[in-house]
Amino acid sequence: MSDLKTEAQDLQQEENALIALRKEKLAAERVKGNAFPNDFRRDSYCNDLQKQYADKTKEELEAAAIPVKVAGRIMLNRGSFMVIQDMTGRIQVYVNRKTLSEDTLAAVKTWDLGDIISAEGTLARSGKGDLYVEMTNVRLLTKSLRPLPDKHHGLTDTEQRYRQRYVDLMVNEETRHTFRVRSQVISHIRKFLIERDFLEVETPMLQTIPGGAAAKPFETHHNALDMAMFLRIAPELYLKRLVVGGFEKVFEINRNFRNEGVSTRHNPEFTMLEFYQAYADYRDNMDLTEELFRELAQLVLGSTDVPYGDKVFHFGEPFVRLSVFDSILKYNPELTAADLQDVDRAREIAKKAGAKVLGHEGLGKLQVMIFEELVEHKLEQPHFITEYPFEVSPLARRNDDNPAVTDRFELFIGGREIANAYSELNDAEDQAERFLAQVAEKDAGDDEAMHYDADFVRALEYGMPPTAGEGIGIDRLVMLLTNSPSIRDVILFPHMRPQA
């Protein structure tokens, strides 16, 4: 038997013994009466007190005798002093033998790390300068039956952190910070758009036709209607129906589902912002996106320089704007324009680069394959990549000067796609033709090609004003702003295989 396996068994036996002891303590609490009281109401948060009274001296606090009521989980227990943690941070509480009853003092000795307590008393400062609550009353509110990870081993196993996020949040301040930032980012995006007259809406999660993106959907069955349905891959077609209906500026922040691979950049369930504005084009969205990203960086980091791993992304500088075609030539100087304009040569280059070439792709699709294999990972600083071929942009408006490409961009930062946007196709007849072309692609073996959506075509036939739309991946954006290496680090409960 390996040493590691033996150590794991020993740790498990030790944990089981601690759990048994804690259950005995809970049983004793039950005998006393209500083991889980719910009549305590706090009036202060730990970190708020730390901030509010940071400049008060020991003498000033003693003279003021400021009464407080706090509650939290015991994270450290040093006998006379305990450290409790609430949603804002930590504070010390002092077990004063002069002000607490003998029964209370005896009970305190039985409490464990992880227990949740209430503490009432006055604020004071220690000789070392630490703020604490000198308790006049303290109670056990919730008995913790499982021990917290100890200081030596901690919760360092990445997979366990994802599976037991509740423990991860208890013991890792970095994790708590990440998800506070995530909430802050979403709140600011919402504020940013509402201030610009966008209306927040909700569109169906269950759809009869999965549309709005090139992706493989999750399929389910509606029992009452006896019909197949799909978890949405994108809200796009419903949001554009709302623009047709007269809601000229709309947005939605919600979940999308794509039945595809899992990686450090992909989770099958993810959060997306999509917004649409009438009487605007994709260039307007580029300007809006730059402004939003600068505000978010300043809000979260206090700077427009965004550190990520060993790199720093500069949000304060104008984002690079480069077409798909030109970016291939810029980052692959051994290739020529003639190479990219010949379908046979482009197919050869795409295959050599590692793309999955089926053999029926047109020139535009092959160019995008080459871009994805040879350019995408090289786009470190923010890049708006524009003029995607119409073959891979079935919902985007063709460019007036070059109908072979569309008025579309994707935003890349750190070699990752963060946003996708375009001037929307509002020609109903052109849209119908492109849907038919997508159906042909699906029949030829492309399981990410789109379905034909007759109702959406009908909506366009009523007339949609010139419109620009965009989708921004919230998870990848939060990864950047929190310097997180994996998408699982910014999703509270990422998808995992069940434990054996």
Curated annotation (Swiss-Prot):
<keyword id="KW-0547">Nucleotide-binding</keyword>
<protein>
    <recommendedName>
        <fullName>Lysine--tRNA ligase</fullName>
        <ecNumber>6.1.1.6</ecNumber>
    </recommendedName>
</protein>
<dbReference type="Pfam" id="PF00152">
    <property type="entry name" value="tRNA-synt_2"/>
</dbReference>
<dbReference type="InterPro" id="IPR045864">
    <property type="entry name" value="aa-tRNA-synth_II/BPL/LPL"/>
</dbReference>
<keyword id="KW-0067">ATP-binding</keyword>
<feature type="binding site">
    <location>
        <position position="417"/>
    </location>
    <ligand>
        <name>Mg(2+) 1</name>
    </ligand>
</feature>
<dbReference type="GO" id="GO:0006430">
    <property type="term" value="P:lysyl-tRNA aminoacylation"/>
</dbReference>
<keyword id="KW-0460">Magnesium</keyword>
<keyword id="KW-0030">Aminoacyl-tRNA synthetase</keyword>
<dbReference type="InterPro" id="IPR004365">
    <property type="entry name" value="NA-bd_OB_tRNA"/>
</dbReference>
<keyword id="KW-0436">Ligase</keyword>
<dbReference type="InterPro" id="IPR006195">
    <property type="entry name" value="aa-tRNA-synth_II"/>
</dbReference>
<feature type="binding site">
    <location>
        <position position="417"/>
    </location>
    <ligand>
        <name>Mg(2+) 2</name>
    </ligand>
</feature>
<dbReference type="InterPro" id="IPR018149">
    <property type="entry name" value="Lys-tRNA-synth_II_C"/>
</dbReference>
<comment type="subunit">
    <text>Homodimer.</text>
</comment>
<comment type="similarity">
    <text>Belongs to the class-II aminoacyl-tRNA synthetase family.</text>
</comment>
<dbReference type="InterPro" id="IPR004364">
    <property type="entry name" value="Aa-tRNA-synt_II"/>
</dbReference>
<dbReference type="GO" id="GO:0004824">
    <property type="term" value="F:lysine-tRNA ligase activity"/>
</dbReference>
<dbReference type="InterPro" id="IPR002313">
    <property type="entry name" value="Lys-tRNA-ligase_II"/>
</dbReference>
<dbReference type="GO" id="GO:0000049">
    <property type="term" value="F:tRNA binding"/>
</dbReference>
<dbReference type="GO" id="GO:0005829">
    <property type="term" value="C:cytosol"/>
</dbReference>
<keyword id="KW-0479">Metal-binding</keyword>
<dbReference type="Pfam" id="PF01336">
    <property type="entry name" value="tRNA_anti-codon"/>
</dbReference>
<dbReference type="InterPro" id="IPR012340">
    <property type="entry name" value="NA-bd_OB-fold"/>
</dbReference>
<keyword id="KW-0648">Protein biosynthesis</keyword>
<feature type="binding site">
    <location>
        <position position="410"/>
    </location>
    <ligand>
        <name>Mg(2+) 1</name>
    </ligand>
</feature>
<keyword id="KW-0963">Cytoplasm</keyword>
<dbReference type="GO" id="GO:0005524">
    <property type="term" value="F:ATP binding"/>
</dbReference>
<dbReference type="GO" id="GO:0000287">
    <property type="term" value="F:magnesium ion binding"/>
</dbReference>
<dbReference type="InterPro" id="IPR044136">
    <property type="entry name" value="Lys-tRNA-ligase_II_N"/>
</dbReference>
